């Protein structure tokens, strides 16, 4: 197969969903049926191939996105298995950035759950074409049709049903293929490897005809010629239907919906067929956005083997045998071992040593890789997640990834002073792997502080430090990552002057500080801090203005109320003055810091806290107690909906009130209720609570 043709035969896909919807089991079955795995790994037995970290096998959840390559028909499928737990959304985010398509797995009983919504929104952000697999159709309470309705209501998606289940719950035995209008039944004795087609039974004929008509109504809209044929009563062929399903999936006009039970080995092969038939190849995506380093011009670069080399590093992983591995998605060109490329973000050269194709945590050495491939590179020195590797002669920077701010922090210290250095090394390695995990030193106490996306996230970091780096640590109580902001605009004119013999220092700045919510035409709503210079006529020379921005950026890390980072504000430099001899970048940096300290208290500063969206699923009888408890935690109930024989309560609750909630919920519901939470937004802390927080600082 020539390299250029090869691109059309590649499918880079992610399998993503809510925790426990059955993503890892689905991936295991895919590996089994494509011949990559000789035995089926079960998640609940701790034997799943994709869950290769010790913690994952113990907890039965997927933490890091393992990448694996398999073949189906004549196509190469690169699969990234992503975690469904909310503390690991960063893994999902960076996987989606480099994928061409995704399979969203839904629990046939629970339907669309909170994390499913988060993942769906992330996929929307990166315009990832996707299809839906309604799993667990064999389980008590599974309802395919309700799940399809939830896709519309919860996600605002346009589902295109292309399969219907045959039998429900324990009698689920196969599917109706609405394209071929045939029933597919699996043989249990062959572990689902053998299946056969038969005619649709009479009792399901009407349902199948109804959904076939809905399918045709949606797909023929994409092609005038086929629509004319359909409206004139002519038969639309299966090939035409498949072509239009592919067209609509790639353009996100709709999302094909399939069903099955991965655990019971039913529905996986048609899912693989659909991945190959309907999800895009790199050539369907066609372009990747980036910037030409030489001109600074943003442009679209073609995805092609014949273009210069460009790749995005999307994950760093420490392998116990190979050391640090950098996973890259190659967008254009090709690369061979021994080549030198440039990291255009850091402006550092990197020599390509070992290149590996990964199957979960088994490795296969390769000498060459090209556009469309996902490979791991061993031994890169300066490359981190989100960096671009590029051809030295034609350097480009591909669109960067954005990572969320951590919402929870812990103080850690090694149990013995001898481990201090080891702990520092371990934490810096783990931070290199995971951009949503940060390490810093508290200036006042000298303590090491680790920050992450939730309690489980930090728990696993500490666990990995113990297992992989042999460092035992004492940990403090979890702390909330509070922030500060201003609520009204203020102006400050500050002059920094220092004369003490020899060279002096002089800088004058006039800055307007204002809340970001008051700023019109803000391109990125999520910007933490915006700086703008409106200096006209050289009141402050151009070369000194970066000093003002740097000073403000540094000083905003310690706010004026309780020393928490300041966010959601804009600083505009409107005037200033300089001295020919005594002014410098440093002098303007100092002046900006002092202006911040003096000006911010006039902006009516407020303390902000992270608010979490909490979803509790509970039997009816505990509803009252659970709502009462959420209200006592300063929660605001958003909605209450029935789901099967349970109730779903959605509330916005401050993170500070949610520590240890898992134990409270267990005792309130005798262990029958469950909850999940995701970060929603920052909001002002009520004044009486703010006083307590200030007193503690």
Swiss-Prot record:
Entry protein name: Elongation factor G
Any GO CC annotation of this UniProt entry: cytoplasm
Keyword Nucleotide-binding: yes
Lineage of origin: Bacteria, Pseudomonadati, Pseudomonadota, Alphaproteobacteria, Rickettsiales
GO BP of this protein: ribosome disassembly
Residues annotated to bind GTP: 17-24, 81-85, 135-138
Organism field: Rickettsia massiliae (strain Mtu5)
Coarse class of the protein's main subcellular location: cytoplasm
GO molecular function ontology, one term from the record: GTP binding
CDD domains: EF-G (cd01886), EFG_III (cd16262), EFG_mtEFG1_IV (cd01434), EFG_mtEFG_C (cd03713), EFG_mtEFG_II (cd04088)
SUPFAM superfamilies on file: EF-G C-terminal domain-like (SSF54980), P-loop containing nucleoside triphosphate hydrolases (SSF52540), Ribosomal protein S5 domain 2-like (SSF54211), Translation proteins (SSF50447)
């Amino acid at each position: 197969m020539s390299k250029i043709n090869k691109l059309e035969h590649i499918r880079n896909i992610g399998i993503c969903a809510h925790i426990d919807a059955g993503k890892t089991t689905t991936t295991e079955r895919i590996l089994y049926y494509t011949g990559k795995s000789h035995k089926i790994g079960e998640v609940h037995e701790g034997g799943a191939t994709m869950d290769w970290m010790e913690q994952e096998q113990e907890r039965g959840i997927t933490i890091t996105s393992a990448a694996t390559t398999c073949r189906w028909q004549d196509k190469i499928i690169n699969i990234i298995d992503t975690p469904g737990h909310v503390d690991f959304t960063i893994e999902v985010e960076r996987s989606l950035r480099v994928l061409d398509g995704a399979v969203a797995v839904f629990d046939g009983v629970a339907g669309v759950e909170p994390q499913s919504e988060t993942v769906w929104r992330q996929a929307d952000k990166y315009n990832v074409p996707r299809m839906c697999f309604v799993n667990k159709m064999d389980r008590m309470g599974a309802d395919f049709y309700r799940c399809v309705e939830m896709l519309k209501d919860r996600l605002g998606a346009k589902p295109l049903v292309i399969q219907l289940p045959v039998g429900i719950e324990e009698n689920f035995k196969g599917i109706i293929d609405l394209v071929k209008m045939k029933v597919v039944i699996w043989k249990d004795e062959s572990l689902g490897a053998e299946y056969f087609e038969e005619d649709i039974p009479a009792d399901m004929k009407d349902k199948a005809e109804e959904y076939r008509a809905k399918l045709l109504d949606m797909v023929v809209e994409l092609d005038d010629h086929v629509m004319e044929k359909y409206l004139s009563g002519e038969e639309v062929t299966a090939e035409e239907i498949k072509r239009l399903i592919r067209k609509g999936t790639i353009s996100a006009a709709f999302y094909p919906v399939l069903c099955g039970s991965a655990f019971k080995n039913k529905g996986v092969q048609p899912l693989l067929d659909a991945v190959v038939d309907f999800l895009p190849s790199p050539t369907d995506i066609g372009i990747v956005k980036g910037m030409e380093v030489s001109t600074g011009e943003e442009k679209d670069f073609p995805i092609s083997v014949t273009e210069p080399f460009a790749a995005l590093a999307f994950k760093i992983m420490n392998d116990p045998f190979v050391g640090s591995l950098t996973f890259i998605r190659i967008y254009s060109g090709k690369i061979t071992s021994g080549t030198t490329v440039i990291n255009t973000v850091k402006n550092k050269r990197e020599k390509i040593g070992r290149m590996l194709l990964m199957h979960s945590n088994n490795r296969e050495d390769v000498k060459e890789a090209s556009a469309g491939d996902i490979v791991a590179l061993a031994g890169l020195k300066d490359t981190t997640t989100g960096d671009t590797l590029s051809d030295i002669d034609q350097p480009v920077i591909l669109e960067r990834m954005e990572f969320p701010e951590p919402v929870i922090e812990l103080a850690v210290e090694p149990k013995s002073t001898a481990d201090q250095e080891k702990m520092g090394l371990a934490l810096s390695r783990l931070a290199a792997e995971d951009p949503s995990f940060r390490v810093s030193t508290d200036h006042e106490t000298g303590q090491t502080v680790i920050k992450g996306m939730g309690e489980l996230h930090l728990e696993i970091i500490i666990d990995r430090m113990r297992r992989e780096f042999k460092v035992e640590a004492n940990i403090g109580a979890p702390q909330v990552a509070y922030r500060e902001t201003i609520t009204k605009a203020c102006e400050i004119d500050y002059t920094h002057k220092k004369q003490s013999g020899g060279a002096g220092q002089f800088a004058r700045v006039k800055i307007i500080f204002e809340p970001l919510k008051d700023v019109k035409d803000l391109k990125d709503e999520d910007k933490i801090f915006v700086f703008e210079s409106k200096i006209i006529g050289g009141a402050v020379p151009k070369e000194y203005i970066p000093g003002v921005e740097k000073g403000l950026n540094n000083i905003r890390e310690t706010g004026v109320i309780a020393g928490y980072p300041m966010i959601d504000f804009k600083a505009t430099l409107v005037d200033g003055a300089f001295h020919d001899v005594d002014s410098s970048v440093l002098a303007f940096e100092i002046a900006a810091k002092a202006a911040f300290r003096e000006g911010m208290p006039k902006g009516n500063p407020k303390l902000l806290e992270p608010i979490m969206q909490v979803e509790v699923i509970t039997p009816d009888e505990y509803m009252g107690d659970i709502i009462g408890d959420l209200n006592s935690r300063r929660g605001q109930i958003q909605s209450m909906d029935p789901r099967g024989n349970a109730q779903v309560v959605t509330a916005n609750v401050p993170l500070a009130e949610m520590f240890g909630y898992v134990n409270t919920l267990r005792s309130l519901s005798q262990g029958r209720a469950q909850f999940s939470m995701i970060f929603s937004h920052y909001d002002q802390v009520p004044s009486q609570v703010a006083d307590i927080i200030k007193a503690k600082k």
